[in-house]
Swiss-Prot record:
Pathway: Isoprenoid biosynthesis; isopentenyl diphosphate biosynthesis via DXP pathway; isopentenyl diphosphate from 1-deoxy-D-xylulose 5-phosphate: step 5/6. Pfam families: GcpE. Its EC number is 1.17.7.3. It comes from Xanthomonas campestris pv. campestris (strain ATCC 33913 / DSM 3586 / NCPPB 528 / LMG 568 / P 25). This is 4-hydroxy-3-methylbut-2-en-1-yl diphosphate synthase (flavodoxin). Coiled coil: none annotated. The lineage of its organism: Bacteria, Pseudomonadati, Pseudomonadota, Gammaproteobacteria, Lysobacterales. [4Fe-4S] cluster binds at C311, C314, C357, E364. Its cofactor is [4Fe-4S] cluster.
Length: 421
């Protein structure tokens, strides 16, 4: 068993807490935990048996920045499709680890489709529904044996919507005998943690190395998630997957995920994240990837694309031009980032500012690598540009947007130069 260490004291400066030391888990070409950068993952919502549709969506998620993608494997057709999906992705030059999401019948599917077991980079196992009664231990062991045979990592993911009822009943019974019983919420959290951690220790007993195990214990409530992961992090050294089980739709889902995950990440807890957004009608599935990246970037965990600071607007900024320019700049740097990642590494750390008036515009622009202070209502029709804190040029006229974009591109080419060798 892992001996929990004392929770570290918060840093005195503005940095995040030190990362929690965990096992490093190799998932395909990605390493989760062990001090490596927090990994962004996502999940498809296609019928996995629809090979063309699944390949298309995995490719979209990968291009958006997802570093691992999970797919439902719930029947023989979806299990048989996995090797073909991997093959087609590789033909497109896409090497992204695919995770098989198993519930109820994973042991049967991998027995029937060993090529699926080989093609997947990781198996997700839910200890709450891997089996029931006397079959539970046997079916869990079968899945772990597949992971050992094919040298695959697993995520043992407990979920409050599919909690191990036998364990929950046991803990409720134990709680009733306490001199001071816990409230129901605390018992539920304990059941989630015990389900995940005890299952992981059982997997180790069966022969799966600790560095092949990732844990999660998901709920939908922000405070509950924070409490569960703080407690679980203190009890084990397994890599942890963070995420609300159902974050919700639109801004609610984004805010809930940010509220929960940012607290844990700031405390050094979490090795991979997924933002479980409910897509709005017509919205791309890639939104969850973008939100995950922005969450990690705004909390200082990673850098994916230049960070654009923009004025929110007020009565001094009756023109919408600064809003339009902020959107143009954001879209431009996101579109250029795949190219810059290869030719201009480090450009993702660049900061940009698009401000709308003289009050905070010049000051905020000086804090950025490149900033522009547009004129507010009644101000002179000119826009000073600041580069690394120094005013360099003043833009005027109808081509401000094009000229500012050109200045950004020039700065990238001049500042972020790939070193030979």
């Amino acid at each position: 068993m892992y001996d929990a260490v004392t929770r570290p004291s918060p840093p005195a400066d503005a940095s995040a807490w030190p990362r929690r030391i965990t096992q490093a888990v190799k998932v395909g070409n990605v390493i989760v935990g062990g001090g490596h950068p927090v990994v962004v993952q996502s999940m498809t919502n296609t019928d996995t048996a629809d090979i063309a549709g699944s390949v298309k969506q995995v490719a979209e998620l990968w291009r958006a920045g997802s570093e691992m993608v999970r797919l439902t494997v719930n029947n023989a057709e979806s299990a048989a499709a996995i090797p073909r999906i991997v093959e087609k992705l590789r033909m497109m030059g896409i090497e992204v680890p695919l995770i098989g999401d198993f519930h109820y019948n994973g042991h049967q599917l991998l027995t029937a489709e060993p090529a699926c077991a080989e093609a997947l980079a990781k198996y997700r196992i839910n200890p709450g529904n891997v089996g029931f009664g006397k079959k539970k231990d046997l079916q869990f062991a079968q899945l772990i044996e597949f992971a050992i045979q094919y040298d695959k990592p697993v995520r043992i993911g407990a979920n409050w919507g599919s909690l191990d009822q036998a364990l929950a009943a046991q803990l409720m019974d134990e709680n009733s005998k306490r001199e001071t019983p816990w409230d129901a919420g605390r018992v539920l959290r304990e059941a989630l943690i015990r389900s995940a951690v005890d299952s992981a220790e059982r997997a180790v007993e069966l022969g799966l190395p600790r560095e092949r195990i990732i844990l999660s214990a998901k709920v939908s409530g922000v405070q509950e998630l924070i409490a569960v992961y703080r407690d679980m992090a203190a009890r084990c050294d397994f890599a942890l997957h963070l995420g609300l089980t159902e974050a919700g739709i639109g801004s609610k889902g984004i805010v809930a995920s940010a509220a929960a995950l940012s607290v844990l990440l700031q405390e050094g807890i979490g090795d991979t994240i997924r933002i479980s957004l409910t897509p709005e009608p017509g919205q791309s599935r890639t939104q969850e990837v973008i939100v995950a990246q922005e969450l990690l970037q705004t909390t200082g965990q990673r850098a994916f694309t230049p960070l654009v600071t923009a004025c929110p607007g007020c009565g001094r900024t009756t023109s919408e031009f600064f809003q339009e320019l902020a959107g143009v700049v954001q879209n431009h740097v996101r579109a250029k980032m795949p190219e810059w990642k290869i030719s201009n590494p480090g450009a993702e750390n660049m900061t940009l500012a698009v401000m709308g008036c003289v009050v905070n515009g010049p000051g905020e622009s000086r804090h950025a690598n490149i900033g522009i202070s547009l004129p507010g209502t009644g101000e002179a029709p000119s826009a000073p540009v600041f580069v690394d804190g120094e005013k360099t040029v003043t833009l005027r006229g109808e081509n401000i947007a094009y000229e500012f974009i050109d200045l950004i591109d020039q700065y990238v080419e001049r500042t972020y130069v790939r070193r030979a060798g």
